[in-house]
Design a protein with these regions (language model features):
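A well-structured
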Residues: 1-158, 459-463, 471-486
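Divalent metal-coordination and catalytic microenvironments
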Residues: 6, 142, 257, 291, ...
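All-alpha helical catalytic cores of prenyl diphosphate-utilizing isoprenoid enzymes
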Residues: 167, 171-174, 199-203, 209, ...
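Secondary-structure capping and boundary motifs in well-ordered enzyme cores
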Residues: 38, 99, 126, 166, ...
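Active-site recognition of the HExxH zinc-binding catalytic motif
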Residues: 142, 246-268, 288-292
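Contiguous, non-catalytic segments that form substrate-binding/exosite surfaces or channel walls
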Residues: 103-250, 459, 469-470, 476-480, ...
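Post-HExxH zinc-binding segment in Zn-dependent metallohydrolases
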Residues: 279-321
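C-terminal, non-catalytic "cap/extension" segments appended to globular domains
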Residues: 21, 34, 38, 52-55, ...
Length: 486
């Protein structure tokens, strides 16, 4: 009965979080810019209210009562996750939560304007305020380093030292692979499709992808935002965004990525566990594994290139003239270093993440100020990728994450890639028609596997249950070697 009481108590928290999600989505897609101050106040209030409910004496009493109750194995796991969340939330003063929320909302708004105008001077004082707030936040937690306090908010199983070790190993493997791919030349010399690409057929392609991957139209929306994102407003209300540019087809990849996130959210067992950890994603690393899986392992595969080829010819007849499925596959996986993370190929993508990880570590553990981030950013891009940004918009202002105070999030992209690589190796053995299904455009078997083994489990499982062991680099590197045929 105690667990049932906890679930009942958390219903109000879930509703408040729904309201926050809707307000965030509206802010990024529809809200008039003049409303930003009132929106910041609203979000600060809602997040403060949630914090109050989760740190109240009543809720603490319910958790204490559950600890003394006779629970089955599943309930014990749920309680463990509830206690972990309570520990994190209780460590933060209410005033800090509200102040951070307000600053985060305002900074995100300013970031969008500053990015458009390539104006770091407009942006960095607000970013520095967020950094100072997050540095203060790290003092509320017991962690080995200040940066660890932020990493564990997105994936509790890792520290900066753990990630650094994994990234070091991955860097070596990627460097070796890049040399082999460059020597082979096929994925380097291939020319891009010729622009321009009208927005209307891009929108049609995005909607087509959303449908064939399995996201239900009556429970989802596709809109436009400065930076693509996915959010869940409530059970059966999943919102994704992308962005369109007539100079390229990057909306193709970003839509597949965000659909992957939304499919995970749509498969969570909210009918039974809404508002509890079991109704939530296992971690942000696992969340990113799902988006990267659909974007890359499915969406950039040779089989998918064959499947999508007729649709591409229909929507972009001039650009696709003379382009075979094999050529399209090479184009979709063109492997040259670039400046923009979300536009990067798989071979170099993780280096973009590693750069951000190293800068975040410098910010929190070594005292790097916001003013100096562009210099360090440009130096690391030249060191790791051999390219140097000419503008802040294509440099340190390209992502919205830091403006949203999501320090510690970036490593989850690469951890997600590694999980997706292991998942691919496992699924190929268990779904004998894996490649054929993709080539035929039949994704139901793949989605069902993900629903049964990951989505429907929420936080009731561990990563090892998904991939048969710890997160490792080998499976992902093997997947890339297979794809690039080197």
């Amino acid at each position: 009965m105690t667990i049932a009481k906890i679930q009942k108590y958390l219903e109000e928290v879930a509703l408040l979080n729904n309201a926050s999600s809707l307000a965030h989505w509206d802010m990024e897609t529809m809200m008039p810019s003049g409303a930003i101050e009132s929106r910041a106040e609203l979000l600060s209030y809602l997040e403060g209210k949630v914090h109050h409910l989760l740190t109240s004496k009543k809720y603490s009493s319910l958790l204490e009562s559950a600890k003394k109750s006779k629970l089955n194995t599943l309930e014990k796991k749920l309680l463990k996750e509830l206690l972990w969340d309570h520990q994190l939330t209780s460590a933060l003063p209410a005033k800090h939560v509200e102040e951070l929320s307000h600053a985060r909302t305002m900074t995100t708004h300013i970031w969008a304007k500053a990015r458009k105008n390539n104006d770091w001077d407009m942006y960095y004082p607000h970013l520095q305020k967020l950094i100072d707030l997050k540095k203060r936040e790290s003092t509320y937690f017991k962690s080995k380093t200040p940066y660890d306090a932020h990493i564990r908010q997105f994936d509790k199983n890792f520290t900066a030292a753990d990630i650094s070790k994994i990234f070091s190993e991955l860097k070596k493997g990627l460097t070796k692979l890049a040399k082999e791919v460059n020597a082979d030349g096929r994925f380097v010399k291939i020319k891009d499709l010729k622009a321009p690409f009208a927005v209307e057929p891009q929108v049609e392609l995005s909607k087509y992808i959303t449908g064939i991957f399995g996201l239900e139209a009556d429970k989802s929306r596709l809109d436009i935002s400065t930076h693509p994102f996915s959010t869940t407003i409530a059970p059966n209300d999943f919102r994704i965004t992308t962005r369109y540019n007539e100079k390229d087809l990057d909306s193709f990849g970003s839509t597949m990525h965000e659909v992957g996130h939304a499919l995970y959210e749509a498969g969570l067992p909210r009918d039974k566990w809404n508002g509890t950890p079991f109704g939530e994603a296992l971690s942000l690393s696992v969340h990113e594994s799902q988006s990267r899986f659909w974007e890359n392992i499915v969406g950039r595969s040779q089989e998918f290139s064959s499947f999508i080829h007729p649709k591409m010819k229909e929507l972009f007849p001039t650009q696709m003239k003379g382009v075979t499925p094999e050529k399209l596959f090479l184009m979709m996986n063109k492997s040259v270093p670039n400046l923009i993370r979300v536009e990067s190929c798989e071979l170099y993508y993780n280096l973009h993440v590693i750069i951000r990880f190293e800068i975040e570590e410098m910010i929190f553990n070594q005292g790097l100020d916001a003013f100096d981030i562009p210099y360090m950013w440009n130096e690391l891009y030249e060191k790791y990728l051999g390219v140097r940004p000419k503008t802040h918009a294509e440099g340190a202002m390209q992502d919205s994450h830091w403006a949203g105070a999501a320090f510690g999030y970036f490593p989850t992209y690469t951890l997600g890639n590694l999980i997706s690589g292991s998942l691919y190796q496992k699924m190929k053995k268990e779904i004998k028609t894996f490649n054929q299904d993709i080539e035929r455009g039949e994704f139901s078997r793949i989605l069902t596997y993900l629903r049964e083994n990951i989505h429907s489990k929420g936080r009731a499982i561990e990563v090892s249950d998904i991939i048969g062991g710890e997160i490792r680099t080998k499976d992902y590197l093997d997947y890339l070697k297979e794809k690039f045929d080197v």
